[in-house]
Design a protein with these regions (language model features):
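A short, charged, amphipathic alpha-helix used as a generic interaction element across diverse proteins
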Residues: 438, 449-471
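Short, mixed-charge low-complexity intrinsically disordered segments
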Residues: 462-498
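Conserved aromatic
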Residues: 63, 203, 261, 445-452
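DNA-contacting surface of Y-family translesion DNA polymerases
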Residues: 5, 186, 196-338, 347-362
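Short beta-strand
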Residues: 104-108, 286-287, 472
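Gly/Gly-Pro- and Ser/Thr-rich, intrinsically disordered tail segments characteristic of DNA damage-repair
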Residues: 1-228, 234, 360-398, 402-420
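Short aromatic-glycine-(Arg/Gly/Cys) micro-motifs in beta-strand/loop hairpins
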Residues: 422-442
């Protein structure tokens, strides 16, 4: 039996949902006038998270600064976001979709996939999709697009065709006429950097991409991504619509910031922290993950997310973190304030069924040793705040990151190398033994079983931050320490017990 997949996407979700609420309260319909949703209408530095169709026709779009939009349209109506209301609208939207098929995968707050293979049978999928679209409009007051296809990829591509309030199909026979003429950026998972690289080689449309061989693509984007791109450009996607039960077979962590962050080193630190937590959990349960996903929530509560497949299942923090960093570069411009960052792993394989690779990068043992030290510290220390990589930002020192210790992208990867993490002006260190929290006036203290590890840690810190200096101090009990100094003040003490 051939598959029939629907992708349902709310048209300009935040704007539509705000409009519905205004109409219910007797106000104007924001969808009929140039209007936008912004995090703080009174702050002209804020960005737009959603725009009405009249606003889009003027050139106003999501992610545009409010100041720029007001120059285009001084009469622009600007309304604040309402997250509680959006959540309620999303839940009601998903409930209607689930009534058509229990095999539902929520892809984001305003879109989902449903597997209609059994429900459709010999019935016309377009007729059912139209009924679903119209039911959402009549019951909830907002419009959606429904894409219909034989897999998730083609269904999602179809839903992005002409909007709003439309049903579109994209069957395999329609790929040459409907999908191949589109620009490469319109293909799912193709970001700005990949688009620029492809265009530089004369690949402008999805059809251009589809006509290349995997070997030709490998020379441009690497072997793993080449196979995925080639498959997507030709409409191939065997991934199932994953229900909530399957989704539970994953691990994730997120961090909401006390205040919106824009400093790349602070955001990188947060991403590092959640990567450590997630990787620790899958190691604890003897799993390895093949898929890494991440999301960021902007100041105005809009969300961007990405997902990628790894070369092989892993539980190594460094590989998970590097994948997350590559995705972060796709969704964040480096200047827009972020409210939250999250990371997850899925497609898990139990360690007992995996075979050890005989061709693993020799450096992997170093990365695994780093993870073992992290796991040991978490197991021995009940108060996680005493762990260096869990300390608050105002503590004495910033956490070490795998990038600052020289951890590269996944072994054997031919993907574009990951740029080094932003260097903090604070000291960087690695926990190798015991940690003692600093007093109000004293430094953070680390204790090691031997001097070699203590010296290696301080050298790593100095390499990461040239403003640091260190010297050796003999202690009364016969041990000695390497003290890290900034501007003549001791900020960390690395004690070697002999």
């Amino acid at each position: 039996m051939s598959r029939v997949i629907f992708h349902i996407d709310v048209n300009s979700a935040f704007l539509s949902w705000s409009a519905v609420k205004r109409v219910m309260e007797g106000g104007q319909d924001l969808r009929l006038v140039p209007s936008v949703v912004s995090g703080d209408p009174g702050d002209r530095r804020s960005i737009i998270s959603a725009a009405s169709m009249p606003a889009k026709k003027l050139g106003i779009r999501a992610a545009m600064p409010v100041t720029m939009a007001l120059r285009i349209c001084p009469q622009l109506v600007i309304v604040p976001g309402d997250w509680a209301w959006y959540k309620r609208c999303s839940e009601e939207f998903i409930a209607i979709c689930r009534s058509y098929s229990p095999v539902l995968q929520q892809f984001s707050i305003d879109e989902c996939f449903i597997d209609m293979s059994l429900r459709c049978g010999k019935r016309d999928p377009v007729e059912i999709a139209t009924r679903l679209k119209d039911e959402i409009k009549s019951r909830l007051g907002f419009t959606v697009n429904v894409g219909v296809g034989p897999n998730k990829l083609l269904a999602k591509m179809a839903s992005d065709f002409e909007k709003p309030d439309k049903v579109h199909t994209l069957w395999e026979s329609e790929i040459p006429s409907k999908m191949w003429p589109l620009g490469v950026r319109d293909l799912l998972w193709v970001g700005k950097k990949t688009e620029e690289r492809l265009i530089a080689y004369g690949i402008h449309t999805i059809g251009d991409l589809a006509r290349l061989s995997v070997g030709q693509l490998t020379r441009l984007v690497g072997q793993k991504f080449a196979a995925q791109l080639h498959g997507n450009a030709n409409g191939r996607d065997d991934s199932p619509v994953e229900t909530e039960v399957q989704e539970a077979k994953s691990y994730s962590a997120e961090r909401t910031f006390p205040k919106d962050l824009v400093d790349p080193k602070d955001i990188d630190r947060a991403l590092f922290n959640v990567a450590c937590i997630v990787a620790h959990r899958i190691r604890r349960d003897d799993f390895r993950a093949s898929t890494v996903s991440m999301f960021v929530k902007y100041k105005d509560f809009s969300v961007a997310q990405r997902q990628t497949s790894l070369d092989q299942p892993t539980d190594v923090t460094a590989l998970i973190l590097n994948a997350a960093r590559r995705m972060l570069a796709e969704v964040w411009d480096g200047v827009t304030p972020l409210r939250q960052v999250g990371l997850g792993v899925s497609k898990l394989t139990h360690e007992s069924v995996l075979q050890m690779s005989l061709f693993e990068d020799p450096k992997m043992e170093y990365y695994r040793d780093w993870d073992r030290q992290y796991d040991a510290e978490r197991a021995r220390t009940e108060d996680a705040r005493l762990l260096a990589y869990e300390r608050k930002p105002n503590a004495a020192g910033a956490p070490a990151t795998p990038e600052s210790t020289g951890i590269p992208a996944s072994p054997g990867s031919t993907a574009v190398p990951v740029a080094p993490a932003p260097q903090s002006s604070e000291p960087t260190y690695v926990v190798l033994r015991e940690v003692t929290a600093p007093s109000e006036s004293g430094p953070l203290v680390f204790r090691y079983p031997d001097g070699e590890k203590a010296l290696a840690a301080v050298k790593m810190a100095v390499r990461s931050d040239p403003s640091l200096r260190f010297h050796r101090v003999n202690l009364p009990d016969g041990s000695y320490s390497f003290d890290l100094l900034r501007d003549g003040k001791v900020i960390e003490r690395h004690v070697a017990h002999v």
